[in-house]
Curated annotation (Swiss-Prot):
The keyword Membrane does not apply. Zn(2+) binds at residues 174, 176, 187. Keywords: Hydrolase, Metal-binding, Metalloprotease, Protease, Zinc. It comes from Bacillus mycoides (strain KBAB4) (Bacillus weihenstephanensis). This is UPF0758 protein BcerKBAB4_4299. GO terms for biological process: proteolysis. InterPro entries: MPN, RadC_JAB, RuvA_2-like, UPF0758, UPF0758_CS, UPF0758_N. Belongs to the UPF0758 family. It comes from the Bacteria. A motif (JAMM motif) lies at residues 174-187. Pfam families: RadC (PF04002), UPF0758_N (PF20582). Residues 103-225 form the MPN domain. NCBIfam families: PRK00024.1 (NF000642), radc (TIGR00608).
Length: 225
């Protein structure tokens, strides 16, 4: 009996999941369950190891593109699609859980809400959180991807969604891929422009949070709002 359990433990992650629960599996074993099979040359666990090694663990894997996944020997379009779909479902479930109950009372609350999703992004993402009168998140929208400047961040795109969602206020966020959240001159100019537009139309811009590598800066706390 022990011999059978040893085989299950080493070679059959799905069976181990059924016996011991998903929480008992390692990252490589969970990945193997999603992949289902290996290739003619290697087992599914070896393929899992290769994927994790290629992406330096889960940190980079969660944001890998279809092409990046398919560049690994043994990963075709079917396996790459399965992984991307699983990761996206995970992100949506986390987002839904927070969105259904998350109230923002401070810059720390806002940074905690978005930190893990934004801190590892390789390009700048400008995101808006739309809040109701209780400061609860009712919607979030990525406005654009790319370097932040006043010619790209148009108030129309920011406030259009606020009207659609009947939002009472907005919090803006963007990340610095360098990991340093110190605001640039462009960051400050964009913020002031959006704050002024919000004041005119009656939808307050509460803050602009810059996300770095596990740290953040609030432009409101810095006196720019």
């Amino acid at each position: 009996m022990n011999g059978i359990r040893d085989v299950v433990r080493e070679e059959q992650p799905r069976e181990r999941l059924l016996l011991e629960g998903a929480g008992s599996l390692s990252n490589r074993e969970l990945l193997a369950v999603l992949l289902r099979t290996g290739s003619k040359e290697e087992t599914v666990l070896t393929l899992s190891d290769n994927i994790l090694h290629h992406f330096d663990g889960l940190r980079m894997l969660k944001d890998a593109t279809l092409e990046e996944m398919m560049s690994i020997h043994g990963v075709g379009i079917a396996k790459a699609s399965q992984l991307m779909a699983a990761f996206e479902l995970g992100r949506r479930m986390v987002r839904l859980e927070y969105q259904n109950r998350y109230s923002i009372r401070s810059p720390e609350d806002c940074a905690s809400y978005m930190m893990e999703e934004m801190r590892f992004l390789q390009q700048e993402h400008f995101v808006c959180l739309y809040l109701n009168t209780k400061n609860q998140v009712i919607h979030r929208q990525t406005i654009f991807i790319g370097s932040l400047n006043t010619s790209i961040v148009h108030p129309r795109e920011v406030f259009k969604e606020a009207f659609r969602r009947a939002a009472a206020s907005i919090i803006c966020l963007h990340n610095h891929p360098s990991g340093d959240p110190a605001p640039s001159r462009e960051d400050i100019e964009v913020t002031k422009r959006l704050v002024e537009c919000g004041r005119i139309i009656g939808i307050e811009v509460l803050d602009h949070i810059i996300i770095g590598d596990h740290k953040f800066v609030s432009l409101k706390e810095k006196g720019h709002i």
